[in-house]
Amino acid sequence: MSAEGDSGPGRREVAYRLFAAEFDDASLSYSESDEERAPNYVVTPTGLRVNRLFAVGVATEVESINDDTLRGRIVDPTGAFVTYAGQYQPEAQAFLDRTTPPAFVAITGKARTFEPEDSDRVFTSVRPESLSEVDADTRDRWVVSAAEATLHRIAVCAAALDSPLRGEELRTALSESGVDDSLAAGVPRALDHYGTTTAYLEGLRQLAVDALELVADEREEVRPLDLEPGEGGDAALGPLPAVDVDLDSAAETSPTIEPEAEPPADSAAEPESEP
């Protein structure tokens, strides 16, 4: 997997790996500035701040929405990525047009969210930059790398949940602990927006482990993630990779506002002296 981190002006954003189930739960998007070319980010419940993503799965459906646009569904072991290709994505449109499902497909593209005017649900999609046909081995390798990345994010997010730090203080502490800038920026936003619970993190952890077992032929299917990010409350987390994230020290050194000292009772009752 490519190194993670922020991309400065003129630099291409990293294409992250994540499962469709988590991407489908995403409902937060924002831009760092009002500049026309400022990147737009989608923040997932574990705090992944993603502008571009890379996914591999099975194209199960291609359909025409109108005269100019095709919609494709690319399914991984946990759910489906939806992609739209129109006149401004001619190569992707041509690829979808000639693809006969089912077919193993890799997609790199921009993460997007959309909320219809008559709905309170936020839908996610991928605006394709590139599409290519791949094989089952490529899909399996992607599943392993996506699972590893997911488990790492869960471990970082769990450490953040255990800390009293929030907002900019949490972002700074995560960055100083060596967490990549993108995840450090996303985790505080995720906790604030979704109220991500340890029960959700445990469900996502089980999903990632199921995906690994599926690739290893130890399981026939991945159990669904039934919880919303803010549901379920506290839960014990199963095994996670070790992450060197020390937020306790940052919390101890975080400045606190001391209450102003009350004046002594006697002096408070004394009238002010005359000039």
Labelled PLM ranges:
Residues 1-42, 202-251, 271:
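OB/S1-fold single-stranded nucleic-acid-binding modules
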Residues 43-53:
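Short, glycine/small-residue-enriched coil/turn segments at secondary-structure junctions
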Residues 48, 58, 64-89:
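OB-fold (S1/OB) nucleic-acid-binding surfaces
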Residues 57, 102-117:
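Flexible glycine-rich surface loops and low-complexity tracts that mediate binding to linear polymers
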Residues 62-67, 116, 136:
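Short, conserved beta-turn/loop elements at beta-strand boundaries and strand-helix junctions
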Residues 89-108:
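Short nucleic-acid-contacting surface segments enriched for D/E, G, S/T with interspersed K/R
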Residues 98-104, 117-220:
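Extended, charge-rich, solvent-exposed interface segments
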Residues 253-275:
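Intrinsically disordered, compositionally biased tail regions
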